Amino acid sequence: MGLRRFKPTSPARRQMIIPDFSEITKKEPEKSLIAPLKKTGGRNSYGRVTVRFRGGGHKRRYRIIDFKRDKVGIPARVVSIEYDPNRTARIALLVYADGEKRYILAPQGLNVGDTVLNGPDAEIKPGNALPLENIPVGTIVHNVEFIPGKGGQIARSAGTSCQLMAKEGKYALLRMPSGELRKVPVKCYATIGVVGNEDHKNEVDGKAGRVRWKGRKPHVRGVAMNPVDHPHGGGEGRGKGHHPQSPWGQLAKGYKTRRGKKASDKLIVRRRNG
């Protein structure tokens, strides 16, 4: 995995930093593991905009990823590392000993030809998935479940990971990518290692067109709108006239937006902001 820079033949080329895709070994996805992906343009089922500044972008097909890692005790061989347009991480195509094919998130250090295993008896090496109760304290993991059997929900983006800090009774203590310390049931599965494509954070789109290819539209400022469209709109000049707000009147700049009481609050040992 590396990054490409370009000769400054234009201002966009001067700034652009993109991956070199040297780790990709196969261009076309496995046909049995793809599904259609319909674009929403940021609209819900009523046709109303629920996420602003979304629309267009290159056509994609969804890759069906195995986040559950529930095929226990059967070894699988890595046959390819592939690009996935729906996520920042790369994905690895596995072929199990019984012939079944599945995609998983490709961790750092996983190469074509390697063998991976799911289950309590798996070795502690990148790509193997085990219950937290069978993983040594201090191990770096990703694709961590919150609810046993539901599938991994945490640390799935490029370069992210959690660290197993302690185990006590029914719960394991994990340090999240945000720095939060959180209890997770020891029966939950996690995959060993750090998610690959760690240089993703250093990529620079370089030009507006590359952002449009991803389906993101220009982010219009509130002060550039009319009063009917935004609390910051209208007026003479560019003044907001009052505290910064969202388009729906919720205060920005430090106002706490987290829901008051959540069932998982009792599992948070230390918040990410202390």
Swiss-Prot record:
One of its GO terms (molecular function) is rRNA binding. Keywords: Ribonucleoprotein, Ribosomal protein, RNA-binding, rRNA-binding. GO terms for cellular component: large ribosomal subunit. The keyword Ion transport does not apply. Residues 229-239 have a biased composition (Basic and acidic residues). InterPro entries: NA-bd_OB-fold, Rib_uL2_dom2, Ribosomal_uL2, Ribosomal_uL2_bac/org-type, Ribosomal_uL2_C, Ribosomal_uL2_CS, Ribosomal_uL2_dom3, Ribosomal_uL2_RNA-bd_dom. Residues 222-274 are annotated as: Disordered. GO terms for biological process: cytoplasmic translation. Pfam families: Ribosomal_L2 (PF00181), Ribosomal_L2_C (PF03947). Belongs to the universal ribosomal protein uL2 family. Part of the 50S ribosomal subunit. Forms a bridge to the 30S subunit in the 70S ribosome. PANTHER family: LARGE RIBOSOMAL SUBUNIT PROTEIN UL2M, RIBOSOMAL PROTEIN L2. One of the primary rRNA binding proteins. Required for association of the 30S and 50S subunits to form the 70S ribosome, for tRNA binding and peptide bond formation. It has been suggested to have peptidyltransferase activity; this is somewhat controversial. Makes several contacts with the 16S rRNA in the 70S ribosome. This is Large ribosomal subunit protein uL2. The lineage of its organism: Bacteria, Thermotogati, Thermotogota, Thermotogae, Thermotogales.
